[in-house]
């Protein structure tokens, strides 16, 4: 269900904005509110002392209410471009994508980055419990600060992408995040504060990793359309979803 929703949701950024920097701002606004939702969902049990069952119940209520409002506003106020009934074969699309070298390069980097992001996600709970000696509350606290600094980082990376190229901004965030993560190798039991600090620094870099790639993808979709005379924005953004998964 989320895949069905996500592909057109991501490609909306391409349809709504044509300006180079405006696409980054649109992507930043979208990811800001996603992170804000994550931030509040992590903060609720810390502030209100909810049990896991209570938290899940309240989050379901909030998701249903805000989702209904959001989808209603989306269908009413977001304009839909006219669709040209032109059939384009899948083989032709894949062949043209193969000949679009900038697109292949970005998708390759995206794939490597997605794999790199999965490893900490899988090992996170084990690292907190068996290396640092933490508990459930420790995990919530680390994630709370991680997403808090991701929120704070979004304006910085958005403005930086205006000063330098988007690809340079993304590269800088990836190298910076990888550099700070190295220090986690030297942590031992009880070094929770140090790990929270590392999480704050890498969380700050997460902002760029969320907002810059979709904006780059929108620009590459324009390039693809100009070069091959075909609008396959939905297909290209579905490739992103596939790579992320």
Give short role names for the model-derived ranges:
Residues 162-176, 225-232:
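Cytoplasmic membrane-interface "Motif A"-like loop-to-helix N-cap segments
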């Amino acid at each position: 269900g989320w895949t069905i929703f996500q592909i057109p949701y991501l490609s909306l950024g391409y349809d709504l904005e044509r300006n180079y920097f405006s696409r980054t701002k649109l992507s930043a606004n979208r990811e800001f509110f996603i992170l804000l939702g994550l931030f509040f969902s992590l903060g609720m049990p810390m502030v209100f002392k909810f049990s896991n069952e209570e938290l899940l119940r309240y989050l379901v209520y909030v998701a249903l209410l805000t989702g209904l409002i959001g989808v209603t506003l989306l269908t009413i106020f977001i304009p839909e471009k006219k669709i040209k009934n032109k059939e384009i074969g899948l083989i032709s699309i894949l062949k043209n994508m193969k000949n679009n070298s900038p697109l292949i390069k970005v998708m390759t980097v995206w794939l490597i980055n997605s794999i790199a992001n999965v490893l900490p996600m899988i090992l996170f709970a084990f690292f907190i419990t068996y290396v640092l000696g933490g508990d459930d509350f420790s995990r919530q606290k680390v994630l709370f600060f991680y997403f808090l600094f991701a929120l704070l980082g979004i304006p910085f990376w958005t403005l930086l992408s205006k000063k330098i190229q988007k690809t340079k901004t993304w590269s800088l965030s990836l190298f910076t995040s990888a550099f700070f993560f190295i220090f986690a190798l030297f942590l031992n039991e009880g070094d929770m504060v140090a790990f929270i600090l590392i999480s704050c620094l890498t969380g700050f870099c997460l902002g760029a990793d969320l907002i810059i790639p979709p904006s780059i993808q929108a620009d590459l979709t324009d390039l693809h359309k100009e070069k091959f005379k075909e609008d396959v924005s939905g297909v290209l953004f579905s490739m992103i979803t596939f790579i992320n998964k």
